[in-house]
Amino acid sequence: MKIDVHHHFYPQAFREALEAAGGDPSGWYIPPWTLELDQEINATLNVTTTILSVTAPGPVIAKDPAAAASLARECNRSAAAIRDAAPAQYGFFASVPSLFDTALALEEIRYALDELHADGVTLFTRYGQGANYLGHEAFAPIWAELSRRQAVVFIHPTHPQDTALINRALPQPMFDYPHETGRTAMDLLTSGRLRQHRGCRVILSHAGGTLPYLIHRAATMLPCMPPDRNIGLSRDEILDTAREVFYFDTAISANEVTLSALARFAKPGHILFGSDFPNAPRDAIVRFTRFVEEEAAALPDGVTVEALKENALQLFPRLKRAEANGVPKI
């Protein structure tokens, strides 16, 4: 049995906003989603609890700040209603408007965590028109509040600045998204944002994207840089911070090469199951999940289904209490 921490849903308001904007800027399609389809895939994957989230580009598809805040509120209320109807089977990560709209974002974090009792908060890898990744100084108040609350933060990639496709066969989520996750993770590490605000537990989508593969490259070179580019941390300090703060989901990443590298890099207890339903093709989701079930345990640093579930229970006290007591908790 599994707890799925990377699992999307499409409230009607979000679907309508995407359609009004001409679709996802990344080039990905808008998949069908209903609660019935959701429950069917959960049964197929042996998922007992699903943490819902709104995928990229999220509420910022509405360009007006007030409209984006209203869309985030509608998405969060929709998620809470699903959770309230089946609290042992569902939870959710809250949506927020653009982090540049600090007051609006902080208010939605407060509302979602205090009044709706969300299990965490979704942030996207980049906001605005420029290279504004999550270590940007404008986002420091957001990180300070999330750290104060010791929140679980689910980081999901969104489209890069350049939305031009390599070709029609490669919409950006297919290959570019993992690079965006690696970029924002390294920005958080090199900006000092994570060391300043240590209270957050941060889930990186898709096995951390390119971070586990490339972090040693950057961490080894950074201490050798000239003073104006030297962040004052040793290689081991950079690696230790990443291992301490970051968790990683397996969504669309469960294969021998990727999971072997991730298991060697991640701190024990920091790998979680994720499906990426409904955005990934169903057959691909099933194939990746079967690898987790049937082959991952045999890897050199084996990853078992039981361990993935226990890791999630440790991260989400509500679910751990429900498991211990045998009753749903909100």
UniProtKB/Swiss-Prot annotation:
The protein's Enzyme Commission number: 4.1.1.52
Database matches in InterPro entries: ACMSD, Amidohydro-rel, Metal_Hydrolase
UniProt keyword Nucleotide-binding, yes or no: no
Amino-acid positions noted as binding Zn(2+) in the UniProt annotation, renumbered to this chain: H6, H8, H156, D276
Keywords, ordered alphabetically: Cytoplasm, Decarboxylase, Hydrolase, Lyase, Metal-binding, Zinc
Gene Ontology cellular component list: cytosol
Keyword Protease recorded: no
GO molecular function: 6-methylsalicylate decarboxylase activity; hydrolase activity; metal ion binding
Cellular localization per UniProt: Cytoplasm, Cytosol
GO biological process: secondary metabolic process
A matching Pfam family: Amidohydro_2
Reaction catalysis annotation: 6-methylsalicylate + H(+) = 3-methylphenol + CO2
Principal location: cytoplasm
Pathway note: Secondary metabolite biosynthesis
Stated family: Belongs to the metallo-dependent hydrolases superfamily. ACMSD family.
Function: 6-methylsalicylic acid decarboxylase; part of the gene cluster that mediates the biosynthesis of aculins. The pathway begins with the synthesis of 6-methylsalicylic acid by the polyketide synthase (PKS) acuA via condensation of acetate and malonate units. The 6-methylsalicylic acid decarboxylase acuB then catalyzes the decarboxylation of 6-methylsalicylic acid to yield m-cresol (also known as 3-methylphenol). These first reactions occur in the cytosol.
Entry protein name: 6-methylsalicylic acid decarboxylase acuB
Species of the source: Aspergillus aculeatus (strain ATCC 16872 / CBS 172.66 / WB 5094)
Encoding gene (name): acuB
